[in-house]
Amino acid sequence: PNPVPHADVVTFTTHKTLRGPRGGCILSTEAIAKKIDSAVFPGNQGGPLEHVIAAKAIAFREAMDAGFADYARRIVDNARALADALADQGFRLVSGGTDNHLLLVDLRAFDEALTGKEAQEVLDQGGVTLNRNTIPDDPRSPFVTSGVRMGVASVTTQGMGTEEMTQIADFTARILRQRDDVAAVNAIAKEVAELCAHYPPYPDSTLK
């Protein structure tokens, strides 16, 4: 659904799923546009960088292409596949699944003693990047948490599909089950690296 016709103000980032450079946009009705401009510039914004503006223009142009719609559909397919695969491994999805690029996972069903902080740290060692996240009625502090948040935009851009989501769920579960075994985590990290080697982020780059 498109919020623009219904909301007075719409904000979004130009990075993340839009795949542009770091930044953001504010869309508004004409009635409050000048107030927003005055609030943003020059107090909170200044020194525009032309190369970043150019990169945003490219991102917007790509978003207008039919291929971007296909990319968005593949993101949702991958997110749902990852959600199903994680559920098969014993994790609980807070919302029972997902309709977008994000998954919020309650770790307690998988391991009551496991915290989001610990999961984030050991998964990072194993080559799986995510972040700790609070869940509804979380008994732990926001710095510790009982959940983690996962996204699939990056791996989808790199060309991974639903089969790879099953592998990612498997890596995640195995790392967490063996989190006290450094050698086992390092061995799984090599498997993760082998998978990623088939999907380089910049396949046409000549830089090594």
Annotate each predicted stretch with a short phrase:
Residues 81, 85-89, 118-126, 169-171, ...:
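Generic non-transmembrane alpha-helical segments
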Residues 57, 74-80, 96-106, 136-141, ...:
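A glycine-rich phosphate-binding loop feature that marks nucleotide/adenosyl-phosphate handling sites
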Residues 142-208:
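PLP-dependent enzyme catalytic core of the Aspartate aminotransferase-like
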Residues 47-50, 67-74, 86-97, 179-189, ...:
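Flexible, glycine/charged-enriched surface loops at secondary-structure junctions
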Residues 1-90, 152:
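Conserved PLP-enzyme active-site core in the AAT-like
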Residues 33-38, 57-64, 97-104, 145-152, ...:
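Short acidic (Asp/Glu) and glycine-rich catalytic loops that position anionic groups and cofactors
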